[in-house]
């Protein structure tokens, strides 16, 4: 079944519905219009590539659709680094990632881009990043105390708020892209390859994010989304960690993903969401979806996770995991949530 089978794709029906305005984000809607094209027009930048002579590969540490990632060493300073060797992709995409990393440089908990290099023979481009002594999330998350969880989610929200305040959506928040050095209590948000500048009333690709962390807007082909997509992904992460159920919404494909969400959040609010934005259910959708009532978070509590669950965290999840993207809590609002009181009180 094609993604478009899930929504009415009648070409005569324009989204959004004629009687509905596109609802702009609560905050940071006009950041890029204020900063001007020299800030966001990545297509017209000229990059100055250095030669990779100062870097040596030590070992492979990961791979993605668009790159291979290695631990490396700067042979001059002897410092560890991370070398991201880019696979052949459109120059535009490479320019976008670099421009975004340059714009966010120095922001809280954002991975630092140290250098950009290109091999003179192969012309293969690589990005050089600071090294983080990361523990794999599958090993780390089950060991975290509630204090640890509060601390790291707060640090992630801090990175997210900064990113949004600079007019940028990450669009691929997931455990694999959150590096944690647990010994030093350092968190870094990585992989800005899908990140994009937010411009009001612009259509965006829904082929972003990773299935388990995709917001409902992506699953129903709602292209006028905004920063709030990222808060959904953080909500999925938080639910997964708290309830020890990672990933929390475990869909087998993009269609089943929405079914898994509906089985928790219910179908009533999903229908309201469709109605509000002038979307129509295609007949095939109802066959997959069925009708589900909203489940209380307490349904997911068991003896292995009950020490992590509190009324505060359940309230925060209620505010993050909302179908209607315009009604989700913002990162800044989330940082003020009572769930983080002890973090705020302990921070200088």
UniProtKB/Swiss-Prot annotation:
PANTHER family: CASEIN KINASE II SUBUNIT ALPHA. It catalyses: L-seryl-[protein] + ATP = O-phospho-L-seryl-[protein] + ADP + H(+); L-threonyl-[protein] + ATP = O-phospho-L-threonyl-[protein] + ADP + H(+). ATP binds at residues 61-69, 84. Casein kinases are operationally defined by their preferential utilization of acidic proteins such as caseins as substrates. The alpha chain contains the catalytic site. Pfam families: Pkinase (PF00069). GO terms for cellular component: cytosol; nucleus; protein kinase CK2 complex. Belongs to the protein kinase superfamily. Ser/Thr protein kinase family. CK2 subfamily. One of its GO terms (biological process) is regulation of cell cycle. Residues 55-340 form the Protein kinase domain. Its EC number is 2.7.11.1. Keywords: ATP-binding, Cytoplasm, Kinase, Nucleotide-binding, Serine/threonine-protein kinase, Transferase. One of its GO terms (molecular function) is ATP binding. Tetramer of two alpha and two beta chains. Its main location: cytoplasm. This is Casein kinase II subunit alpha. It comes from the Eukaryota. It is found in: Cytoplasm. The active site is at residue 172.
